[in-house]
């Protein structure tokens, strides 16, 4: 893949120039911490992602001389056009010697017409590893997303037998962000990075992974990614297009010896909870990936004991994470499902202990649009529907299902 890259002579000149002016030379060697931002915005989110990047640059940023670095992979539309090529680029974001933020282009991927693919993401992350070898990596991906559900699948597919929606007038809600997609020519033709491809695209283990994507807070996604990261920050509902919190992102990830992921989740929750009307809509979950196996064991015990109670009618009574007019109606609260399956007191105690360890923090606004959020544990799960043969077959390929056998 052809790329325009800065040549080493320029880097050498920068070092010499810094030395001649009494400035600290740029850091070389193995970095302590590298934060990677991936903004897949060649879609209707392009303007929002540009604003997020500007907010990130307003934060406390490391300087070139420090052993910490912020790297941003960005792919946006050109003036909102889905037909005009605009090559993605890799930037280094840092605080210059004058105190102002700098976005320095490291690489432009001229031949990468589609960034929403396993191959493209792997290329970029391999480049980051090569340019910035580090003891610790953290990553945030921002784009559309549908959790574990295939990107092109909606509730109307397969003509499944589901509970009819209550008759209600259509309401115009604020736009949300639906792991990663790109519009090819028009918004009706989107290419997605499916969950398992996303997992395959990450070449190194990261300390934390923040997904600024809709509906990422499902146990199926978390379990699929558990061996790639120590912690996940995800949302079981959709996310408004303003996205995660970016004006304090870098300081909370890099301002001390350890990333303060709980404080970041609290900042996200407070940002949305302080709004009013339909904009007061947000959920956030912090997952300790090392505790997911214990959660699977506790949930599997409930499922094995009460499988006969696993009926499609539960989709009408279990706490949902999708609002009534959504066309993605596959996300239900894991704990509430266990309770409605008829779990015993002992089984619920074991599940609650596993959830407390696995989900050290979660928070929800009182509602998301017109969906009341009343019985939430922070993780969603699928309730199988017999009429969805294709979706159920897809579910069988997930690591979570291999562990708990929800779909048989």
Feature-to-residue mapping (PLM):
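N-terminal extension/subdomain marker
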Residues: 21-134, 395
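Catalytic-core segments of thiol-dependent peptidases
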Residues: 75-82, 88-102, 113-204, 213-214, ...
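Bacterial N-terminal signal peptides that target proteins for export
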Residues: 1-9, 235
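Structural recognition of the beta-strand scaffold that forms the well-ordered cores
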Residues: 34-38, 69-74, 138-141, 207-211, ...
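Terminal, contiguous helix-loop blocks that mediate binding/assembly
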Residues: 26-28, 165-408
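Short acidic, gly/pro-rich beta-turn/loop elements at beta-sheet edges
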Residues: 45-47, 80-82, 149, 221, ...
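Hydrophobic helical h-region of N-terminal Sec-dependent signal peptides
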Residues: 10-14
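C-terminal motif of bacterial Sec signal peptides marking the signal peptidase cleavage site
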Residues: 16-19
């Amino acid at each position: 893949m052809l790329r325009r890259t800065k040549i080493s002579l320029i880097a050498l000149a920068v070092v010499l120039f810094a030395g001649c002016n009494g400035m600290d030379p740029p850091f070389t060697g193995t970095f302590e911490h590298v934060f990677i931002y991936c903004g897949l915005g060649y879609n209707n989110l392009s303007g929002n992602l540009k604003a997020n990047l500007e907010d990130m640059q307003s934060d406390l940023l490391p300087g070139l001389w420090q052993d910490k670095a912020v790297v941003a992979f960005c792919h946006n539309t050109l003036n909102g056009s889905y037909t005009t090529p605009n090559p993605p680029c890799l930037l280094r974001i840092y605080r210059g010697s004058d105190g102002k933020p700098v976005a320095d282009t490291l690489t432009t991927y001229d031949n990468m017409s589609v960034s929403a693919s396993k191959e493209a993401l792997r290329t970029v992350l391999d480049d980051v590893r090569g340019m910035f070898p580090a003891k610790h990596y953290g990553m945030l991906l921002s784009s559309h997303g549908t959790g574990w559900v295939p990107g092109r699948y909606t509730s109307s597919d397969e003509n499944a037998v589901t509970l009819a929606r209550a008759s209600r007038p259509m309401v115009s809600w604020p736009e949300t962000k639906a792991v990663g997609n790109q519009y090819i020519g028009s918004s009706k033709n989107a290419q997605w990075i499916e969950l398992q491809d996303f997992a395959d695209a990450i070449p190194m283990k990261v300390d934390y992974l923040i997904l600024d994507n809709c509906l990422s807070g499902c146990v199926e996604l978390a379990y699929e990614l558990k061996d790639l990261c120590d912690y996940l920050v995800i949302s079981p509902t959709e996310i408004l297009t303003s996205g995660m919190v970016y004006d304090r992102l870098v300081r909370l990830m890099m301002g001390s010896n350890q990333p303060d992921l709980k404080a970041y989740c609290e900042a996200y929750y407070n940002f949305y909870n302080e709004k009013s009307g339909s904009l007061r809509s947000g959920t956030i979950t912090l997952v300790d990936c090392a505790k997911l196996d214990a959660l699977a064991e506790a949930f599997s015990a409930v499922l094995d004991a009460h499988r006969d109670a696993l009926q499609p009618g539960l989709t009408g009574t279990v706490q949902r994470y999708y609002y009534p007019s959504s066309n993605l109606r596959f996300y239900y609260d894991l704990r509430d499902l266990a309770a409605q399956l008829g779990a015993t007191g002992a089984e619920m105690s074991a599940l609650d202990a596993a959830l407390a360890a696995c989900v050290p923090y979660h928070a929800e606004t009182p509602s998301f649009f017109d969906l009341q959020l009343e019985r939430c544990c922070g993780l969603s799960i699928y309730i199988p529907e017999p009429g969805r043969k294709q979706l159920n077959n897809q579910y069988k390929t997930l690591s979570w299902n291999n562990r708990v056998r929800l779909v048989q």
